[in-house]
Design a protein with these regions (language model features):
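Anaerobic metallocofactor- and corrinoid-dependent redox/one-carbon enzyme cores
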Residues: 15-475
Length: 475
């Protein structure tokens, strides 16, 4: 049962500054009690830039000492503050400096030692996941970048908590197609190495365009080079809260337009964001580190009533993937951003609505029923906060086709000046109509059909870099 000691008076955020009426305070309490509102993740960013060295044992020792020193109290502090306010904090995580930079001087075979040191340190401090086995290669590779990408499959198949991410494109640099090709192969090999778990290793690997430096969500979190020595970034949740508010308004009998529904989502996002910032500032103050950002993203779970898909159904869609799905998602994403931006001046990360298929019951069911295709999901990613996320595809899909899917999604991000990402899971030995089970927050996914296999090899094989887009001619 949640603690009754949850009070706004004890926080540094006064009632006057929140501009909340008594009714809105009551609604916030209801959101916590019965509508699945939680803080999805408190992520501590830790700089490892001072951990570089000439040998793997030296680097590993420095990394472990740094993480133990910075993060030893993270979990206990989060639990204390969760109890104080009665607000669940689901995950406690770490994000570190991109390891490609930290381990630059090491040989490729030594990167696995570094990854295992990260995994051990994460286990010792009690966090769920550690992000930052990462490289930024949108314009080209360093030696360390290549070593890191080469070792991703082995690292993700032999560690429990380490997550990997690679930025292969940006609006200013274009798309590094050599990196895209390598990541297609890395995804396939990671899948094969974790075939006994339905390719689960790929759930810890994200390929990005315009990768944010302060994202608290896994598997794409890392500590950017412009970030402080250590910093708290928080990701809130709340699809269930938004759904309940929409249902309450729709069932009131009033004549509502989509503009009215957008306003309801906006007000709800405001309340959710205030809760997230309260927790973030309290944790940062208790740990003596900087407060960074609140990520506004509506992150679903496999739990009934905690689904972005259910929100789209509330907005009038009989099936997710039907005509109108992209417009409904655009409405939701924009309203969430507007409400959150009004609630906090420290909004960052991804901030919008996620559509991770395996982690959302309604999206997964839409795939099973044949209503939601890969092509429709790609269209929807042009207006939401992330991309093709947690999508299980047949194990027979070749590496070049995977790379071509990556390239398509990167192009959406590059041209539209937004973050896009791909987390595809080729499931070895399974095909359309079968199901992959990942467990926990990762949920389960019905295998999605990928059409036109083995028809993109020549395109991917050209390699090189797709140039950055012109910005003066906006159409």
């Amino acid at each position: 049962m949640r603690s009754a000691s949850w009070t706004l008076e004890s926080s540094s955020i006064s009632l006057r500054s929140t501009m909340l009426s008594s009714d809105e305070i009551i609604r916030t309490v209801e959101m916590l009690k019965s509508e699945n509102l939680d803080v999805r993740t408190v992520t501590l960013g830790v700089s490892l830039r001072d951990c570089a060295g000439d040998s793997a044992p030296e680097v590993c020792h420095r990394i472990q000492e740094k993480i133990r020193g910075q993060a030893r109290d993270l979990v206990s502090t989060c639990e204390q503050i969760s109890k104080k306010y009665g607000i669940p904090i689901v995950n406690k995580r770490l994000a570190v400096t991109p390891i490609a930079a930290v381990a630059e001087s090491l040989a490729a075979e030594e990167y696995l030692q570094v990854a295992r040191a990260l995994d051990q340190a994460a286990a010792e401090v009690g966090v769920n996941f550690l992000g930052g086995y990462s490289a930024l290669v949108q314009k080209g590779f360093t030696k360390g970048d290549r070593h890191l990408i080469e070792t991703i499959p082995e690292v993700l198949s032999s560690t429990a908590r380490v997550c990997a991410s690679v930025n292969v494109a940006s609006t200013r640099a274009g798309i590094n197609m050599d990196a895209v090709s390598l990541m297609g192969k890395a995804i396939k090999e990671t899948s094969l190495r974790t075939a006994d778990r339905d390719g689960f290793g790929c759930a810890k690997l994200v390929v990005f365009a315009n990768m944010p430096e302060d994202n608290p969500f896994m598997a794409g979190a890392y500590l950017g080079f412009g970030e402080p020595e250590s910093v708290i970034n928080v990701g809130v949740s709340g699809p269930g809260v938004v759904k309940k508010e929409l249902e309450r308004a729709i069932h009131s009998g009033k004549k509502l337009t989509l503009g009215d529904l957008s306003e309801i989502i906006k007000r709800t996002s405001f309340r959710v964001t205030r809760v997230g910032e309260l927790i973030a500032r309290e944790v940062a103050q208790a740990l003596g580190v900087s407060f960074g950002i609140v990520d506004l993203s509506l992150a679903p779970t496999p739990t009934v009533g905690d689904s972005v898909g259910e929100i789209l159904r509330c907005l009038g869609l009989d099936s997710i993937g039907a005509p109108g799905s992209t417009a409904a998602l655009a409405l939701l994403n924009d309203a969430v951003k507007k409400g959150g931006a009004f609630a906090s001046s420290s909004v960052g990360g991804l901030s919008g609505a996620f559509i991770p298929v395996s982690e959302d019951l309604n999206l997964s069911e839409a795939v099973r029923q044949g209503h939601l295709s890969l092509e429709k999901l790609e269209a929807m990613t042009s207006v939401c906060s992330l991309g093709l996320d947690m999508i299980a595809i047949p194990g027979k899909v070749d590496a070049n086709t995977v790379a071509a899917i990556l390239a398509d999604e990167m192009a959406i991000g590059v041209i539209n000046h937004k973050t896009t990402a791909v987390r595809l899971i080729p499931v070895p030995g399974k095909d359309v109509g079968e199901k992959a089970v990942f467990g926990g927050l990762f949920g389960e996914a019905h295998i999605l059909e990928v059409r036109n296999l083995n028809r993109s090899a020549a395109f991917v094989g050209f390699g090189g870099r797709i140039p950055a887009p012109i910005t003066s001619i906006s159409n």
